[in-house]
């Protein structure tokens, strides 16, 4: 609540009537902010007497002890991003799959997981079939893709921020990657992103909770496409999203939007274009 009071104009959420308090769900969400995306969902659930979720986080966030402690306090579990060997990574992912299955089906607890590895720094909310493949690992020989995910009760989540405190950093990262062919993260970069995301001004934040998805096709790609479609359809576009699209389409000038003109002052043309696209890509 303090984060909302200090750094948001408002926080709105819709779709809790799609959930039953005594059921567990697999919430699959678009991903814009490392810690706040699941935190906003947890806040909406908690305020309405639903149980909070177990949160999937990448192992890259565990390098610093305070971040690891914060994540564990938050009912988080680790998804390995690296390992010594392929076999070791496979074993770890199998353990994650087992954990997710047991939480949902035995403990009746819900799970939050992002639709792709890492935040959508380009504003393209596309579900990675590899995420679904990992979740299905433990039962892949017993249950078909569609039957499995129907059992998991998948709920699409869309979160949108009027202002993303990390928008320029994301744009600069994409720019450097394009320019140099690679991007080397500094040691504390993810932690600085977490801090900036929490303390930076976000304006209006909207969280939309969709209806349970009914899967009919037995392929990870088709299931991923369906999740992407649902997340995209219920995404709330703020004035920043709409203005970014209008600037790209030459309907208005950059100077017509105070936020973009201030934020992008003295930035190279390529960075301006990348950051505008980050906001505009959600506008269909």
Regions found by a protein language model. Name each.
Residues 1-25, 31-54, 59-65, 94-111, ...:
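Membrane-interfacial terminal anchoring regions of lipid-handling membrane enzymes
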Residues 54-65, 69-82, 86-90:
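Conserved nucleotide-cofactor-binding alpha/beta core module
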Residues 115:
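Active-site-proximal binding-pocket segments
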